[in-house]
Amino acid sequence: VTNFCNEWVSYSQMIKRFLSLMVLNTVCYQASALELNVYLWEDTIAPNVVEAWHKKTGVSVNLYHFDNDDERSLLMLKSVQLPFDIMVLDNVSAFIFSRQNVFEDLTSLPNRANNDPMWLQACGTHAVPYFWGSVGIAYRKSLFDKPPTQWSEVVDIAPAHRGRVGMLKDSVETLLPALYMLNASPITDSIDTLRQAYRLLDAANPHILTYEYVLSYVRSHPQTDNLHMAVSYSGDHYSLNRFFNTQDWDFSVPEGRPYLWVDCMAVNSVSPNTVQAKAFLDFLMKPDIAAINAEYIRAASPNYKARALLPVEHREDLSIYLPEQRLAEGIIDSELSAKNLSLRAKIISSVTYQYEAKP
Protein backbone atom coordinates (compact mmCIF):
# COMPACT_ATOMS: atom_id res chain seq x y z
CA VAL A 1 0.00 0.00 0.00
CA THR A 2 2.83 2.39 0.85
CA ASN A 3 4.41 1.92 -2.58
CA PHE A 4 1.09 2.70 -4.18
CA CYS A 5 0.58 5.83 -2.14
CA ASN A 6 4.09 7.12 -2.74
CA GLU A 7 3.51 6.88 -6.47
CA TRP A 8 0.02 8.30 -6.21
CA VAL A 9 0.77 11.66 -4.56
CA SER A 10 4.09 13.26 -3.75
CA TYR A 11 5.15 13.62 -0.15
CA SER A 12 5.10 17.42 -0.40
CA GLN A 13 1.51 17.38 -1.65
CA MET A 14 0.52 15.17 1.25
CA ILE A 15 2.18 17.50 3.78
CA LYS A 16 0.41 20.49 2.25
CA ARG A 17 -2.93 18.71 2.53
CA PHE A 18 -2.22 17.59 6.08
CA LEU A 19 -1.20 21.06 7.22
CA SER A 20 -4.31 22.60 5.69
CA LEU A 21 -6.42 20.19 7.71
CA MET A 22 -4.49 21.06 10.86
CA VAL A 23 -5.06 24.77 10.25
CA LEU A 24 -8.76 24.18 9.76
CA ASN A 25 -8.84 22.34 13.04
CA THR A 26 -6.72 24.64 15.19
CA VAL A 27 -7.83 22.96 18.40
CA CYS A 28 -6.44 19.57 17.25
CA TYR A 29 -6.49 17.22 20.21
CA GLN A 30 -6.48 19.93 22.83
CA ALA A 31 -10.22 20.22 22.31
CA SER A 32 -12.63 19.37 25.06
CA ALA A 33 -14.89 16.35 24.91
CA LEU A 34 -17.71 18.73 24.03
CA GLU A 35 -16.88 18.36 20.34
CA LEU A 36 -16.10 15.57 17.93
CA ASN A 37 -14.15 15.91 14.69
CA VAL A 38 -15.37 13.68 11.87
CA TYR A 39 -13.60 13.02 8.55
CA LEU A 40 -16.03 11.92 5.83
CA TRP A 41 -17.32 12.38 2.30
CA GLU A 42 -19.23 15.54 1.47
CA ASP A 43 -22.99 15.53 1.90
CA THR A 44 -23.09 12.22 3.79
CA ILE A 45 -24.73 13.11 7.08
CA ALA A 46 -28.09 14.77 7.59
CA PRO A 47 -27.82 18.19 9.29
CA ASN A 48 -30.83 17.42 11.49
CA VAL A 49 -29.12 14.23 12.70
CA VAL A 50 -26.13 16.29 13.84
CA GLU A 51 -28.50 18.76 15.48
CA ALA A 52 -30.40 15.96 17.25
CA TRP A 53 -27.15 14.57 18.64
CA HIS A 54 -26.05 18.00 19.88
CA LYS A 55 -29.42 18.62 21.49
CA LYS A 56 -29.31 15.23 23.21
CA THR A 57 -25.70 15.37 24.45
CA GLY A 58 -24.40 18.93 24.17
CA VAL A 59 -21.51 17.59 22.08
CA SER A 60 -20.79 19.48 18.84
CA VAL A 61 -19.75 17.73 15.64
CA ASN A 62 -17.21 19.31 13.28
CA LEU A 63 -17.20 17.89 9.75
CA TYR A 64 -14.13 17.72 7.50
CA HIS A 65 -14.31 16.34 3.98
CA PHE A 66 -12.24 14.27 1.57
CA ASP A 67 -13.23 13.48 -2.02
CA ASN A 68 -11.48 10.19 -2.72
CA ASP A 69 -10.49 7.14 -0.69
CA ASP A 70 -6.85 7.25 -1.76
CA GLU A 71 -6.44 10.82 -0.51
CA ARG A 72 -7.74 9.82 2.90
CA SER A 73 -5.70 6.63 3.08
CA LEU A 74 -2.51 8.46 2.09
CA LEU A 75 -2.98 10.94 4.90
CA MET A 76 -3.53 8.12 7.39
CA LEU A 77 -0.51 6.16 6.20
CA LYS A 78 1.77 9.14 6.73
CA SER A 79 0.41 9.98 10.18
CA VAL A 80 -2.19 7.95 12.02
CA GLN A 81 -2.32 10.60 14.75
CA LEU A 82 -4.75 12.76 12.83
CA PRO A 83 -6.96 15.34 14.57
CA PHE A 84 -10.12 13.32 13.92
CA ASP A 85 -12.12 11.30 16.41
CA ILE A 86 -14.18 9.48 13.78
CA MET A 87 -13.32 8.56 10.21
CA VAL A 88 -15.42 7.22 7.36
CA LEU A 89 -13.47 4.83 5.20
CA ASP A 90 -14.00 2.03 2.71
CA ASN A 91 -14.23 -1.52 4.00
CA VAL A 92 -10.80 -2.50 2.67
CA SER A 93 -9.07 0.36 4.49
CA ALA A 94 -11.05 -0.47 7.62
CA PHE A 95 -9.41 -3.91 7.74
CA ILE A 96 -5.94 -2.63 6.81
CA PHE A 97 -5.84 0.01 9.52
CA SER A 98 -7.54 -2.22 12.08
CA ARG A 99 -4.63 -4.65 11.74
CA GLN A 100 -2.36 -1.76 12.75
CA ASN A 101 -4.42 -1.09 15.91
CA VAL A 102 -5.39 2.33 14.60
CA PHE A 103 -9.07 1.95 15.53
CA GLU A 104 -11.10 1.06 18.60
CA ASP A 105 -12.92 -2.28 18.83
CA LEU A 106 -16.62 -1.54 18.27
CA THR A 107 -18.15 -4.96 18.83
CA SER A 108 -19.69 -3.89 22.15
CA LEU A 109 -21.86 -1.11 20.70
CA PRO A 110 -25.49 -2.11 21.41
CA ASN A 111 -26.97 -0.83 18.14
CA ARG A 112 -24.37 -2.60 16.01
CA ALA A 113 -26.76 -5.57 15.95
CA ASN A 114 -29.25 -3.51 13.91
CA ASN A 115 -27.10 -4.01 10.81
CA ASP A 116 -27.27 -6.87 8.33
CA PRO A 117 -24.54 -9.52 8.93
CA MET A 118 -23.30 -9.05 5.35
CA TRP A 119 -22.32 -5.44 6.00
CA LEU A 120 -21.03 -6.08 9.52
CA GLN A 121 -18.69 -8.67 8.07
CA ALA A 122 -17.57 -6.24 5.37
CA CYS A 123 -16.46 -3.65 7.96
CA GLY A 124 -15.03 -6.03 10.56
CA THR A 125 -14.76 -5.65 14.32
CA HIS A 126 -13.12 -2.22 14.46
CA ALA A 127 -15.58 -0.37 12.23
CA VAL A 128 -19.33 -0.31 11.69
CA PRO A 129 -21.19 -0.10 8.37
CA TYR A 130 -22.51 3.35 7.54
CA PHE A 131 -23.83 3.09 3.98
CA TRP A 132 -23.39 0.87 0.97
CA GLY A 133 -24.10 1.17 -2.72
CA SER A 134 -22.84 0.54 -6.22
CA VAL A 135 -20.58 2.24 -8.71
CA GLY A 136 -22.41 3.42 -11.80
CA ILE A 137 -23.03 6.38 -14.07
CA ALA A 138 -24.75 9.60 -13.05
CA TYR A 139 -26.26 11.21 -16.14
CA ARG A 140 -28.54 14.06 -17.19
CA LYS A 141 -31.83 12.63 -18.42
CA SER A 142 -32.48 15.60 -20.71
CA LEU A 143 -29.36 14.77 -22.73
CA PHE A 144 -29.94 11.03 -23.21
CA ASP A 145 -32.61 9.15 -25.12
CA LYS A 146 -32.19 6.22 -22.72
CA PRO A 147 -30.11 5.52 -19.60
CA PRO A 148 -26.51 4.40 -20.14
CA THR A 149 -26.50 0.61 -19.86
CA GLN A 150 -22.92 -0.16 -20.94
CA TRP A 151 -19.64 0.86 -19.32
CA SER A 152 -18.29 1.46 -22.81
CA GLU A 153 -20.37 4.65 -22.94
CA VAL A 154 -17.86 6.47 -20.71
CA VAL A 155 -14.82 5.09 -22.57
CA ASP A 156 -15.86 4.79 -26.22
CA ILE A 157 -17.70 8.09 -25.96
CA ALA A 158 -20.40 9.12 -28.44
CA PRO A 159 -19.68 12.39 -30.31
CA ALA A 160 -22.49 14.24 -28.52
CA HIS A 161 -20.85 13.60 -25.14
CA ARG A 162 -17.16 14.01 -25.95
CA GLY A 163 -15.50 16.41 -23.57
CA ARG A 164 -18.51 16.11 -21.26
CA VAL A 165 -17.64 12.98 -19.25
CA GLY A 166 -16.39 12.77 -15.67
CA MET A 167 -14.24 9.93 -14.36
CA LEU A 168 -12.96 9.03 -10.88
CA LYS A 169 -9.35 9.08 -9.70
CA ASP A 170 -9.12 5.91 -7.67
CA SER A 171 -7.12 2.69 -7.75
CA VAL A 172 -10.21 0.65 -8.70
CA GLU A 173 -12.79 3.05 -10.11
CA THR A 174 -10.51 4.74 -12.67
CA LEU A 175 -9.90 1.44 -14.44
CA LEU A 176 -13.30 -0.09 -13.75
CA PRO A 177 -15.17 1.00 -16.93
CA ALA A 178 -12.37 -0.16 -19.22
CA LEU A 179 -11.99 -3.46 -17.37
CA TYR A 180 -15.71 -4.15 -17.66
CA MET A 181 -15.43 -3.43 -21.39
CA LEU A 182 -12.85 -6.21 -21.49
CA ASN A 183 -15.19 -8.55 -19.58
CA ALA A 184 -12.70 -8.52 -16.71
CA SER A 185 -13.16 -8.05 -12.98
CA PRO A 186 -12.56 -4.48 -11.76
CA ILE A 187 -10.14 -5.91 -9.19
CA THR A 188 -8.21 -8.16 -11.60
CA ASP A 189 -4.48 -8.58 -11.09
CA SER A 190 -3.82 -9.66 -14.68
CA ILE A 191 -0.97 -7.51 -15.99
CA ASP A 192 -2.01 -8.02 -19.61
CA THR A 193 -5.63 -7.07 -18.89
CA LEU A 194 -4.62 -3.96 -16.94
CA ARG A 195 -2.40 -2.88 -19.83
CA GLN A 196 -5.29 -3.34 -22.25
CA ALA A 197 -7.45 -1.21 -19.96
CA TYR A 198 -4.74 1.44 -19.94
CA ARG A 199 -4.79 1.61 -23.74
CA LEU A 200 -8.57 2.08 -23.72
CA LEU A 201 -8.35 4.88 -21.15
CA ASP A 202 -5.50 6.53 -23.01
CA ALA A 203 -7.63 6.62 -26.17
CA ALA A 204 -10.57 8.07 -24.22
CA ASN A 205 -8.50 10.77 -22.51
CA PRO A 206 -9.02 13.53 -25.11
CA HIS A 207 -12.77 13.27 -24.50
CA ILE A 208 -12.72 13.33 -20.67
CA LEU A 209 -13.82 16.53 -18.95
CA THR A 210 -12.52 15.77 -15.46
CA TYR A 211 -11.10 13.12 -13.14
CA GLU A 212 -12.40 15.00 -10.12
CA TYR A 213 -15.15 13.39 -8.05
CA VAL A 214 -18.41 14.65 -9.55
CA LEU A 215 -19.70 16.35 -6.37
CA SER A 216 -16.39 18.12 -5.86
CA TYR A 217 -16.28 19.13 -9.51
CA VAL A 218 -19.68 20.79 -9.57
CA ARG A 219 -18.97 22.62 -6.31
CA SER A 220 -15.74 24.03 -7.72
CA HIS A 221 -17.40 24.78 -11.09
CA PRO A 222 -20.93 25.84 -10.05
CA GLN A 223 -21.67 27.66 -13.30
CA THR A 224 -20.62 24.84 -15.58
CA ASP A 225 -23.11 23.17 -17.88
CA ASN A 226 -20.46 21.00 -19.51
CA LEU A 227 -20.91 17.77 -17.58
CA HIS A 228 -23.26 15.25 -19.20
CA MET A 229 -22.41 12.10 -17.27
CA ALA A 230 -19.87 10.84 -14.76
CA VAL A 231 -18.69 7.63 -13.15
CA SER A 232 -20.06 8.00 -9.64
CA TYR A 233 -21.55 6.33 -6.60
CA SER A 234 -25.20 5.52 -6.04
CA GLY A 235 -26.91 8.42 -4.34
CA ASP A 236 -24.69 11.05 -5.96
CA HIS A 237 -27.42 11.99 -8.43
CA TYR A 238 -29.63 13.10 -5.54
CA SER A 239 -26.86 15.37 -4.28
CA LEU A 240 -26.45 16.76 -7.81
CA ASN A 241 -30.16 17.46 -8.09
CA ARG A 242 -30.08 19.16 -4.69
CA PHE A 243 -27.09 21.26 -5.70
CA PHE A 244 -28.54 22.36 -9.04
CA ASN A 245 -32.14 22.52 -7.78
CA THR A 246 -33.30 20.23 -10.56
CA GLN A 247 -34.54 16.69 -11.16
CA ASP A 248 -32.46 16.16 -14.29
CA TRP A 249 -29.79 13.88 -12.84
CA ASP A 250 -30.35 10.13 -12.60
CA PHE A 251 -28.19 7.08 -11.95
CA SER A 252 -27.65 3.86 -13.85
CA VAL A 253 -25.76 0.69 -12.95
CA PRO A 254 -24.56 -0.70 -16.30
CA GLU A 255 -24.88 -4.35 -17.24
CA GLY A 256 -22.56 -6.88 -15.66
CA ARG A 257 -21.77 -7.78 -12.08
CA PRO A 258 -22.26 -4.65 -9.97
CA TYR A 259 -19.26 -3.31 -8.10
CA LEU A 260 -20.30 -2.59 -4.52
CA TRP A 261 -18.81 -0.02 -2.18
CA VAL A 262 -19.18 -0.10 1.59
CA ASP A 263 -18.53 2.92 3.79
CA CYS A 264 -17.59 2.12 7.38
CA MET A 265 -17.15 4.38 10.41
CA ALA A 266 -14.28 3.93 12.85
CA VAL A 267 -13.07 5.58 16.04
CA ASN A 268 -9.46 6.77 16.13
CA SER A 269 -7.60 4.99 18.94
CA VAL A 270 -5.50 8.08 19.75
CA SER A 271 -8.58 10.26 20.20
CA PRO A 272 -9.07 11.62 23.73
CA ASN A 273 -12.81 11.42 23.08
CA THR A 274 -13.31 7.72 22.36
CA VAL A 275 -16.23 7.39 24.78
CA GLN A 276 -18.21 10.17 23.11
CA ALA A 277 -17.14 9.01 19.64
CA LYS A 278 -18.45 5.50 20.30
CA ALA A 279 -21.66 6.96 21.69
CA PHE A 280 -22.08 9.01 18.51
CA LEU A 281 -21.67 5.92 16.31
CA ASP A 282 -24.18 4.04 18.45
CA PHE A 283 -26.54 7.01 18.08
CA LEU A 284 -26.18 6.88 14.29
CA MET A 285 -27.14 3.19 14.34
CA LYS A 286 -30.42 3.78 16.16
CA PRO A 287 -33.15 2.76 13.67
CA ASP A 288 -34.96 6.12 13.67
CA ILE A 289 -31.73 8.10 13.30
CA ALA A 290 -30.33 5.78 10.63
CA ALA A 291 -33.60 6.12 8.70
CA ILE A 292 -33.47 9.94 8.81
CA ASN A 293 -29.87 9.84 7.63
CA ALA A 294 -30.57 7.40 4.79
CA GLU A 295 -33.54 9.37 3.51
CA TYR A 296 -31.57 12.62 3.48
CA ILE A 297 -28.45 11.17 1.85
CA ARG A 298 -30.41 8.87 -0.46
CA ALA A 299 -28.05 5.98 0.07
CA ALA A 300 -28.63 2.35 0.96
CA SER A 301 -28.71 1.73 4.69
CA PRO A 302 -27.08 -1.42 6.11
CA ASN A 303 -29.44 -1.05 9.09
CA TYR A 304 -32.34 -3.47 8.55
CA LYS A 305 -34.39 -1.96 11.38
CA ALA A 306 -33.99 1.49 9.83
CA ARG A 307 -35.09 0.25 6.41
CA ALA A 308 -38.41 -0.83 7.90
CA LEU A 309 -39.02 2.81 8.88
CA LEU A 310 -38.20 4.29 5.49
CA PRO A 311 -40.87 5.32 2.96
CA VAL A 312 -41.79 2.70 0.37
CA GLU A 313 -40.49 4.90 -2.45
CA HIS A 314 -37.05 4.92 -0.82
CA ARG A 315 -36.94 1.17 -0.22
CA GLU A 316 -38.04 0.47 -3.79
CA ASP A 317 -35.73 3.01 -5.44
CA LEU A 318 -33.58 0.87 -7.75
CA SER A 319 -31.01 3.64 -8.07
CA ILE A 320 -30.32 3.12 -4.34
CA TYR A 321 -31.10 -0.54 -3.61
CA LEU A 322 -30.13 -3.09 -6.22
CA PRO A 323 -32.59 -5.88 -6.99
CA GLU A 324 -31.81 -8.95 -4.89
CA GLN A 325 -30.45 -10.93 -7.84
CA ARG A 326 -28.02 -8.19 -8.86
CA LEU A 327 -26.97 -7.66 -5.25
CA ALA A 328 -26.22 -11.38 -4.95
CA GLU A 329 -24.01 -11.11 -8.06
CA GLY A 330 -22.19 -8.04 -6.75
CA ILE A 331 -18.45 -7.76 -6.23
CA ILE A 332 -17.65 -6.20 -2.87
CA ASP A 333 -14.55 -4.04 -2.79
CA SER A 334 -11.64 -6.18 -1.58
CA GLU A 335 -7.95 -5.79 -0.77
CA LEU A 336 -5.53 -5.69 -3.71
CA SER A 337 -1.98 -6.98 -3.61
CA ALA A 338 0.91 -4.52 -3.39
CA LYS A 339 1.98 -5.53 -6.92
CA ASN A 340 -1.53 -4.92 -8.28
CA LEU A 341 -1.75 -1.54 -6.53
CA SER A 342 1.67 -0.50 -7.80
CA LEU A 343 0.81 -1.26 -11.43
CA ARG A 344 -2.56 0.48 -11.12
CA ALA A 345 -0.86 3.52 -9.61
CA LYS A 346 1.54 3.74 -12.55
CA ILE A 347 -1.32 3.42 -15.04
CA ILE A 348 -3.45 6.04 -13.32
CA SER A 349 -0.50 8.39 -12.95
CA SER A 350 0.21 8.11 -16.68
CA VAL A 351 -3.44 8.54 -17.67
CA THR A 352 -3.98 11.60 -15.49
CA TYR A 353 -0.63 13.10 -16.54
CA GLN A 354 -1.68 12.82 -20.19
CA TYR A 355 -5.06 14.29 -19.31
CA GLU A 356 -3.50 17.28 -17.56
CA ALA A 357 -1.05 17.81 -20.42
CA LYS A 358 -3.70 18.01 -23.12
CA PRO A 359 -4.23 21.46 -24.67
At which residue positions do the language-model features occur?
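A bilobed periplasmic-binding-protein/Venus flytrap-type ligand-binding module shared by bacterial periplasmic
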Residues: 136-143, 179-184, 261-273, 292-293
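Extracytoplasmic ligand-binding site segments that recognize negatively charged/polar headgroups
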Residues: 83, 90-209, 214-221
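Mature extracytoplasmic/periplasmic domains
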Residues: 268-328
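Periplasmic-binding protein-like
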Residues: 114, 133-135, 195-204, 244-269
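N-terminal signal peptide c-region/cleavage motif recognized by signal peptidases
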Residues: 28-30
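A ligand-binding cleft/hinge motif common to bilobed small-molecule-binding domains
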Residues: 93-98, 223, 228-247
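Early extracytoplasmic/lumenal segment of secretory-pathway proteins
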Residues: 34-96
